[in-house]
Amino acid sequence: EVARANELGMDVIITDHHLPQDVVPKAYTILNSKQATDPYPDNMLCGAGVAWKLSCALLARRREAWSVPVGWEKWLLDMAGLSTIADMVPLKNENRAIAYFGLKVLRKSPRLGLKKLLAKMDMPQANIVEDDVGFMIGPRINAASRMGNPIDAFRLLASTDEREAEEFADHLTHLNETRKGLVASMVKEARKHLEARARDN
């Protein structure tokens, strides 16, 4: 995709937080503090944390041109904080701050899809804590990539349509229930094998 974008004269910026491979795409730039040549001091940000830092940098340069109010970027912290907690990166240094302030924004977030998802769980938005994200919200959002199409999670969180948001919240809730059923089945099967081996020994 990057090579094709280059052919079309497009500049591609890649954000990542995984250990880079030996060969990386020839993008305009790659933001990944795990690269050996990257001077950024904190290399434990999750993917959304890296993307949020890019957003802050872009706004620092283009705020007036884009007519973006000072401090608006804090409203993106709901997604950065949610991802930081759900991705289980170490909650220290910048991650700790992103998670802390992300929870504050998450409790006030106007995102329609998030509100619909919380309603499915009977979870009061104003009372969300770290465990809610890690064990309730995060698994439902992650179910999109594990059991279906990852773009569905984006569509849920980006939706501004009541019916669409409701449908995606239902869909992700169903996917998560299916995932839990599969995990329970796999655990049951593994236990049977272990018990059989124990009897044989």
Describe each PLM feature range.
Residues 4, 50-54, 98-101:
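Alpha-helical scaffold elements adjacent to nucleotide-binding pockets in ATP/GTP-utilizing enzyme cores
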Residues 1-4, 23-28, 42-44, 63, ...:
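Short acidic, glycine/serine/threonine-rich loops at helix termini
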Residues 1-26, 30-33, 189:
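N-terminal small/polar loop signature for handling phosphorylated ligands or for N-terminal nucleophile
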Residues 26-65, 73-85:
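Short alpha-helices
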Residues 9, 60-201:
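Hydrophobic helix-and-loop "lid/oligomerization" segment in the mid-to-C-terminal part
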Residues 19-20, 35, 90, 145:
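Short, glycine/acidic-enriched loop or turn micro-motifs at the edges of active sites
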